[in-house]
Amino acid sequence: MKFQLWVSTGILLVSLLPCHECRAFIKSPASSPGALLPALSNSQPFLLRMGEEYFLRLGNLHKHSPGSFPEASAGNFVRAVQQLQAQQWSSQPGMRAASLDGADSPYSAQEDPTEKAKRAEEPPISLDLTFHLLREVLEMARAEQIAQQAHSNRKLMDIIGK
C-alpha cells in the first residue's frame, strides 16, 4: 500500500512539474538573455540547444520553442546552418576579391582555376542522404531526450524513496 502511494505521488509530481518554457518564465525577469543560455544548455539535447540559441539571437525564444516541435526545430536549425554557410561563403577571400572587382556572381571569369577544380572534384550531396542524416539526428535527439527524462525520473524516485 505504501509503495503504491509513493508511486502515485511520484507520478503526480512529475506530471505537475512545469515545462521548460514555463521554468524560463518563473525565473527572475531581471536576468538577461545571456544568463538564460547556461540554464538551457544542460536541460536539452545539443541540436535543440543550438536552435534555442538561434531563436534567442532573433529575440523570439518563447514565441516558438523548438523543444515542443522537433521537426520544426530541425527545419529552423537547417535554415540557421544555411544562413551561417552563406555568411561564411561571402566572407571567403576569393568571394571578397570578386565582389571588390565588381563581379556579378562568384562564377565569373575572374575566379581562381584551382577553386573551380576543387569544386568540380567534390561530389554533390544527395538530397536523400541529407534527409537520411537529418532523420538520424532527430532520432538521436529523441533518444537523448528520453534518456534525460528517464534519468530525471530515477532521481525523483530516489528522492521520494529516501
Swiss-Prot record:
One of its GO terms (biological process) is negative regulation of glucagon secretion. Keywords: Amidation, Cleavage on pair of basic residues, Hormone, Secreted, Signal. Residues 1-24 form the signal peptide. GO terms for molecular function: corticotropin-releasing hormone activity. The gene is crh. GO terms for cellular component: cytoplasm; extracellular space. Residues 91-122 are annotated as: Disordered. This is Corticoliberin. The lineage of its organism: Eukaryota, Metazoa, Chordata, Craniata, Vertebrata. Residues 25-119 form a propeptide. Coiled coil: none annotated. Pfam families: CRF (PF00473). Its main location: secreted. InterPro entries: Corticotropin-releasing_fac_CS, CRF, Urocortin_CRF.
